[in-house]
Regions:
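Catalytic phosphate/metal-binding cores of nucleic-acid and nucleotide-processing enzymes, i.e., regions
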Residues: 91-94, 177, 207-209
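Metal-dependent nuclease catalytic regions and adjoining charged, substrate-binding loops involved
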Residues: 52-65, 197-258
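Metal-dependent nuclease catalytic cores that hydrolyze phosphodiester bonds in DNA/RNA
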Residues: 47-162
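Active-site metal-coordination segments of metallo-dependent hydrolases
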Residues: 176-184
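Short, mixed charged/polar active-site loops
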Residues: 147-151, 164-165, 229-238
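Conserved catalytic cores of phosphodiester-cleaving nucleases, focusing on short active-site segments
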Residues: 152-176, 190
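Accessory DNA-engaging acidic/polar modules
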Residues: 1-50
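An active-site-proximal "capping" alpha-helix that borders the catalytic cofactor pocket
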Residues: 184-195
Length: 258
């Protein structure tokens, strides 16, 4: 990547060209695989060799775990266009679901694993300061030999007492025993990231292996029980379901077809 001296009033132009914002450095940058020539007015004049080296880097497609279930199932062609040509549908879930995820994580993260389910071995949930906010796999290859990376933000990561690991993803949804299978590629993708860790902007994803438990914790809205002023108590039914088996080979097949 190449960091840029992009002023605030030109950030939209930079973003439209494919520039990305690094929150830690508080600077815009040209991601690997994006031609830096269009960004030259924000690059120091003595960086000519760096620009040439950067432009030789092949673009690596990054796939989010959630896209491998939801986005492909909804519109395969849209998924292809977004990853291959950068054409986005901007069909994102409402922000309220992200807020629900944060509230749910905050409630469970300091609890014992048995608080969620007796099916889970004894262990603890890794805290926010033990994991990067966003995690990335190392460079992986599909069945056609094409490079890709998996990049995402997990909900709950478990370290069991025997130093094996688990991942739980939150879903606000109708409870079903089939939910883990419905989100199987997302769950397997998170496990694959931790077992084949890479880095984002020099921040390394830790190696957590083996991952032995993959599960969905479902929240099904039931009723409002009490109201106090402009606040109310919303009751949810909970459903916990595990993915029966790891499906790494099927994940690679899925990426290849995508």
């Amino acid at each position: 990547m190449i960091f840029l001296n992009c002023p605030f009033d030109e950030k939209d132009e930079c973003k439209a060209l494919g520039g990305k914002w690094n929150a830690e450095r508080k600077k815009w940058y040209v991601p690997d695989g994006i031609d830096a020539s269009s960004f030259q007015k924000w690059i120091e004049s003595d960086k000519k060799e760096q620009i040439l080296a950067h432009n030789k880097i092949k673009k690596v497609i990054e796939l989010s775990p959630s896209s491998l279930d939801f986005q492909i199932n909804k519109c395969h062609r849209c998924f292809y266009l977004s990853k291959k040509l950068g054409i986005q549908t901007n069909n994102f879930p409402p922000p309220v679901f992200n807020q629900l995820d944060l509230i749910q994580k905050d409630f469970f993260i300091d609890k014992d694993t048995s608080f969620i389910s007796e099916k889970l071995p004894k262990g603890r949930f890794l805290q926010d300061n033990e994991l990067p906010k966003k995690i990335s796999s190392s460079l992986l290859k599909d069945n056609k030999g094409r490079d890709f990376k998996l990049v995402g933000i997990p909900d709950l990561v478990i370290e069991f007492e025997d130093k094996t690991y688990g991942i739980i993803d939150f879903k606000t949804t109708k409870i079903s025993e089939k939910k883990a299978d419905f989100y199987k590629f997302q769950l397997e993708a998170y496990a694959t990231i931790f077992e084949n860790p890479g880095e984002i902007n020099s921040i390394k994803t830790p190696l957590l292996s083996p991952v032995i438990k993959l599960a969905i914790l479902q929240f099904d809205p039931l009723k409002i029980e009490n109201k106090n002023g402009m606040n109310c108590n919303f009751i949810f039914d909970l459903g916990y379901v595990e993915l029966e088996n790891r499906i790494y080979e099927k994940l690679i097949d899925r990426v290849t077809l995508a």
